[in-house]
């Protein structure tokens, strides 16, 4: 499947059309951003790692009965995916307190959240992805109540699958975000799942193994991503 016109260029991925209107090419670049895109750097191998990591995770989720946009790996940094009508709201699950939750509520980082928290954020970098709720989604017409309920259900199901997957690899799934879209009327998981959009800590040391290494200038970003991938059994080379 050959990519054609560039449709969208995000902070770390580019989307291309194909000869099939139902399919797109998702290209993972080496770009890494923080502060809603204000800080951007390039890291060798990052696009390849995230592409293969995402394919691995999406395959695991599909095997668990969660519909995803993934069709096939095309190359080291490209994947063939379904063309979704994306919902402008992202779902976040928090198993432990970290990031904006700690800043907002003043709770201790690492606090276990039982049951896990479910948050919604409007996808808008210019407005710094403001937190919203179900009422906002209905009033502004971002997503129907039925589709939002399905998104919530699939997000919690993904959390069950992935928490065990990472725990078996000696990692804590602290939190993560998921984006969904509609494909022929069905809610389908889109975008990506990688250490760019999840917080992953080593179970024993609590070392951060995700993009917080870049956000907090800890160093060793690619080494951490590669270690997570290797622990899970993702074939990188």
UniProtKB/Swiss-Prot annotation:
Family: Belongs to the SAICAR synthetase family.
Pfam name, any one: SAICAR_synt
S-S bridge residues: none
Keywords: ATP-binding, Ligase, Nucleotide-binding, Purine biosynthesis
Entry keyword DNA-binding: no
Name of this protein: Phosphoribosylaminoimidazole-succinocarboxamide synthase
InterPro entries tied to this protein: SAICAR_synt/ADE2_N, SAICAR_synt_PurC, SAICAR_synth, SAICAR_synthetase, SAICAR_synthetase_CS
Source organism (scientific name): Erwinia tasmaniensis (strain DSM 17950 / CFBP 7177 / CIP 109463 / NCPPB 4357 / Et1/99)
Superkingdom as given in the UniProt entry: Bacteria
Pathway(s) annotated for this protein in UniProt: Purine metabolism; IMP biosynthesis via de novo pathway; 5-amino-1-(5-phospho-D-ribosyl)imidazole-4-carboxamide from 5-amino-1-(5-phospho-D-ribosyl)imidazole-4-carboxylate: step 1/2
NCBIfam families: purC (TIGR00081)
GO molecular function, one term: ATP binding
GO BP, sorted A to Z: 'de novo' IMP biosynthetic process; cobalamin biosynthetic process
Gene Ontology CC annotations of this record: cytosol
EC number assigned by the record: 6.3.2.6
Swiss-Prot/TrEMBL catalytic activity: 5-amino-1-(5-phospho-D-ribosyl)imidazole-4-carboxylate + L-aspartate + ATP = (2S)-2-[5-amino-1-(5-phospho-beta-D-ribosyl)imidazole-4-carboxamido]succinate + ADP + phosphate + 2 H(+)
Residue intervals passing through the bilayer: none
């Amino acid at each position: 499947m050959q990519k054609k016109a560039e449709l969208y260029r995000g902070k770390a991925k580019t989307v291309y059309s194909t000869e099939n209107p139902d399919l797109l090419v998702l290209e993972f670049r080496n770009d890494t951003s923080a502060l809603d895109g204000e800080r951007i750097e390039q890291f060798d191998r990052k696009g390849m790692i995230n592409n293969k990591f995402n394919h691995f995770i999406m395959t695991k989720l599909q095997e668990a009965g969660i519909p995803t946009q993934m069709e096939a790996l095309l190359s080291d940094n490209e994947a063939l995916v379904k063309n979704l009508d994306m919902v402008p709201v992202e779902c976040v699950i928090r198993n432990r307190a970290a990031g904006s939750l700690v800043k907002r509520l003043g709770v201790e980082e690492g606090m276990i959240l039982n049951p896990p928290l479910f948050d919604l954020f409007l996808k808008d970098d210019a407005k710094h992805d403001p937190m919203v709720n179900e009422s906002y989604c209905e009033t502004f017409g971002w997503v129907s109540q039925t589709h939002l309920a399905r998104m919530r259900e699939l997000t919690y199901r993904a959390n069950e699958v992935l928490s065990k997957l990472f725990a078996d690899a000696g990692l804590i799934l602290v939190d993560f975000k998921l984006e969904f879209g509609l494909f022929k009327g069905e809610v389908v998981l889109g975008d990506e799942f990688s250490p760019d959009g999840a917080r992953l800590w080593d179970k024993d040391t609590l070392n951060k193994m995700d993009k917080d290494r870049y956000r907090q200038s800890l160093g060793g970003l690619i080494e951490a991503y590669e270690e997570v991938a290797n622990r899970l059994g993702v074939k990188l080379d």
